[in-house]
Amino acid sequence: MSKKKILCYVLLTAMLVSMFVAGEVSVAAEQQKPAYSNLADVKSRKEVRSALLSAGISAKTADAWLKDVVSYNKTIKNTSLVKKNFKKMGKKPPVYNENRISKLWLKKNKLFIGYNCRITAYDLMKDYIKVGNTGKANPSQLFMDRDALKNAPTKKFSGKQRKAFESIFSTVQTKYTKNVATHAAIWAKDWKNKKISVSCDTQASLISVVLHSSFSKTENELFVGHTGVLVPTKNHKYLFIEKLSFQLPYQVTRFESKEQLNDYLMGMYDTEWGQDTAK
């Protein structure tokens, strides 16, 4: 049976769980278009590093992550990347030369498939997310994440952090319904059972795209299909930090508002219509 997926959005910040629902928000006409960077130049890296530190992310964590970014960009020879600063987005998301990027990546990395969105987001947020009960995790969908961590050039997480990572991004059993509130309540209950908490000592937020997969009326799951970290800037805007996929680039996008971010994510990942799944 085919796997049906549709999206709901979860904003996880300072122990608050709230759902973004498609159609409830839209980008105001007077707002500037989002602009994105792949951190291929020193200036953009300094800007993002400053925003991370201001949000409470440690210099050690930020610098280690930026080292990963520089290494990745060098490996793919800056293919399809924004070479300097930030570039305004068009009506459609940026397009990357996946074929050339993949060839360049595989030329250097035989076993390591790269870091993805979940590994990147948790790496930045790991000091502020605590999991009290890791025994209830269902990491069945994280087989590629596990492979990436196993074959990474350096050990990314400690044993305790690895268990926390798998708990946070665990598959959650849900009901056969299109009601987003029902799925949100089930997701919140799962976090409560796992004793997952997000510290108030950071202004950074973990933003996750939660997929509802329906195999049948009795087999339904929720899973974080994409995630990133949102940090505020000094001029009251937001930077959304994400790794697009294992082999695709790091991307940092500047948004005028959280509503603009929601519209961006819906445009990227809301790809099904008329399915028996929640939106």
How would you name each of these model-derived features?
Residues G23, V27-K279:
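Cysteine-nucleophile amide-bond enzymes
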Residues K4-V25:
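Sec-dependent N-terminal signal peptides of Gram-positive bacterial secreted proteins and lipoproteins
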